[in-house]
């Protein structure tokens, strides 16, 4: 239970929009609505910004996961009652559903970690990076939120397998020629494929495309994996393209278990995002960047932009009930944990907020219709994502600090149905102390056991557990390639439910963090909802001045995000 400090009454008590939760989608929406001139109240029950996209210290991450994991069902809600000060409304109690399950947290070097625990900024929804050309960057530039966040490059990307070998992802002409793991034939095949993709992309932007080679419409509608086979690419190259560049999750060669068989046109779009991200910013080493101090900086950047435009922020303030019109059933406002009643035209809610089923039985059809987006819906195929966070001493790859590792389906064990992604981040990003790294792991799964098994397999492939009888800080274990594996100091494993956003007329619910590596779908959900709320009004129509749209980045390799 969150202790609510005494708050003075909010003034005003009427707004155009109330937003609950400071995740990425909610924060983008609050910033956009504030920029359009709407009055916005932005609340969060937590004492920090970011909600499920927050970056936290180790103690705070531990506390959040335990307090928000699956717990016994709450006692039945009391029936809706009219607020004491206005009998034209009824109040409907809200409850929080748990997004997390199978939470397991282990510490192997407690004294060292306790000494440095507040020097960690650990992502709750990792691994996640930003493509230099993705929509989140475009929105940051358009809104001016880029003034409040700094980035650094991801140094390298690798593909892993059960042998423990990490192979570089050949994602550019220079990388292909430098790659010693590819034969001359494979290099030529990969270069030919990339040239075809670039020619196709060029033909779609040029008026006179008679001299460019274009992929046929028939091929564009075929499965991407079949198109790669048609191009006579060997399995190793196909795997790199599918899972380490296009960033697919499911085994594209197994139609029985693949839930999303990608078409070639979608695959080309994914490759286009990767290709256009390479070199977009002069001091970015590759396609991927990451915010200094953690991904929690992204929602905070949009919150700061919203505050400049007049949005009012209150943390540590849950809402406890919705206020509905007794006659029409329409939404009118919310009751805060402080007891104050606040009114608005529209309401946007965190994915955890829902109504107890017991509360619905005594409501009218109109009232139930208003609340329909908040009623938990059973899903036939309930997809989840298993996440892991590790603090390690050492690096998974010598002389590399910030790196992405992808394990394609079946690369670690035969039953591995989905790709496993691992992101290593170092102290240069201000996420951990020097000489340590933070690893984030994730994989889609149908159930908790399946997901945790996959994560543990990737962990054992990359890192070594300390020997219980000899937990000396400098102890290391050698792998089969005579290289030393990093030592695990701390670990968190958990499974997160994937909740889709529900868009209603006056009440909408935002999605939970998804299973993607980037923010495109998360940002897209905010853009779609904004269009429904504001109609044809342009998102962030006010342009920032050139001086305001530039970061003052003069330090250790930071990436300047500017037009």
Curated annotation (Swiss-Prot):
GO-annotated cellular components: cytoplasm; Rab-protein geranylgeranyltransferase complex
Coiled coil (residue ranges): none
Record's subunit section: Heterotrimer composed of the alpha subunit RGTA, the beta subunit RGTB and REP; within this trimer, RGTA and RGTB form the catalytic component, while REP mediates peptide substrate binding.
Family: Belongs to the Rab GDI family.
Sequence ranges of Acidic residues compositional bias: 550-563
Keyword line: Cytoplasm, GTPase activation
Name this polypeptide is given: Rab escort protein 1
Major subcellular site: cytoplasm
Alphabetized Pfam families for the sequence: GDI
Tissue: Expressed in roots, leaves and flowers.
GO biological process terms on file: intracellular protein transport; pollen development; pollen germination; pollen maturation; pollen tube growth; positive regulation of protein geranylgeranylation; small GTPase-mediated signal transduction
Compartments where found: Cytoplasm
Keyword flag Ligase: no
Organism, as annotated: Arabidopsis thaliana
Residue ranges of the region described as Disordered: 538-563
